[in-house]
Amino acid sequence: MMEAVHFGAGNIGRGFIGETLAANGFKINFVDVNETIINALNQRGEYTITLAAPGEKKIHVDNVDGLNNAKDPEAVVKAIAQADLVTTAIGPKILPIIAPLIAQGLQARDAANNHQALDVIACENMIGGSQSLKKSVYEHLDDAGKTFADTYVGFPNAAVDRIVPQQKHDDPLAVSVEDFKEWVVDESQMKNKDLKLKTVDYVPDLEPYIERKLFSVNTGHATTAYTGKYLGYTTIGDAIKDPKVFNQAKGALAETRSLLLSEFKNFDEKDLENYQNRVLQRFQNPYISDDISRVARTPIRKLGYDERFIRPIRELKERGLNYSVLMDTVGMMFHYVEPNDAEAVKLQAMLKDQPLVDVIKEVTGLKDAGLIDEVEASVKSKDR
């Protein structure tokens, strides 16, 4: 039986990546610091996924165990040394933290003369996740280790898409996910091209798919969340029923669609519109009760220069295309208040202590004076 090491035993790890690996016949070693989940995985060796869709179908996942990387890093190194595949779903900020452990695992492979090609795939909500992880891993390898990794280890970037809502269960391993899923891997960066997973798409150029997902799902979801919060809603399901929120999301996606069509000639306009309409339908799924606080969390990161709003705004402006709905949404983001979100608290503190223009420059990284003025006007237009 093939073995996978998967970093991140959270809802996405178990409810999406784990499901896919299990369906492809892998034994899965989940790596996490959450003792409750790791212990439950080891005690039971299985868990159940519920699809948030009519019929609420159950999917059984077995041949799983858990490794606590804080308490037993040696076991993780040993698992990587003999793994057929390594994946992550832990969040972009945690990738550099697991890099030393992956580096040790690769060194252990080298020491064991394991020359089987290995791919390390970061399944994160970011552009270039695997290559970013590679950079961090290589910081912990000596020249011989880098040579080994260059020869036998691939870090193919991936785009992943599945809504896994905030949820609470008595069973720590139970997880509910939407029935839609998409996992796309950049085949050109793979080392083990013989290992292809069913239900995963392999493409020669990932960029169009990553941008399509980022500027449709991520931009659309965040637009729904920040507009909904501004209008007083607490869940995505309730917010999107309001025509103001729905039209804001639809308008934002129309703007990002014009950008995608101008940037990538392989997209068909009707197909892209259908894809984005499906995205909006997913947000309306009555089986998913997603809190706005989850979707809108980390507003400072989401206002970043290369993130889901500022980047399309910049690129639309460069092309002379409309970005008014995106800009309007950015104005609402600066008014996002959520006491349990450290970044939201920090953003409001910055706005209280510094001139608005300085905060805009710091948070968005914008240098374009015209765009900075537009953001300022948008924020002020949302004052109450």
UniProtKB/Swiss-Prot annotation:
An example molecular function term from Gene Ontology annotations: mannitol-1-phosphate 5-dehydrogenase activity
Positions of NAD(+) binding: A4, V5, H6, F7, G8, A9, G10, N11, I12, G13, R14, G15
GO biological process terms held by the UniProt record: mannitol catabolic process
Catalytic activity: D-mannitol 1-phosphate + NAD(+) = beta-D-fructose 6-phosphate + NADH + H(+)
Ranges that cross the membrane: none
Gene Ontology CC annotations of this record: cytosol
EC number: 1.1.1.17
Keyword Oxidoreductase: yes
Top-level enzyme category: oxidoreductase
InterPro entries in UniProt: 6-PGluconate_DH-like_C_sf, 6PGD_dom2, Mannitol_1_phos_5_DH, Mannitol_DH, Mannitol_DH_C, Mannitol_DH_CS, Mannitol_DH_N, NAD(P)-bd_dom_sf
Keywords of this entry: NAD, Oxidoreductase
Family the UniProt entry places it in: Belongs to the mannitol dehydrogenase family.
Protein name, per record: Mannitol-1-phosphate 5-dehydrogenase
Species: Lacticaseibacillus paracasei (strain ATCC 334 / BCRC 17002 / CCUG 31169 / CIP 107868 / KCTC 3260 / NRRL B-441) (Lactobacillus paracasei)
Gene designation: mtlD
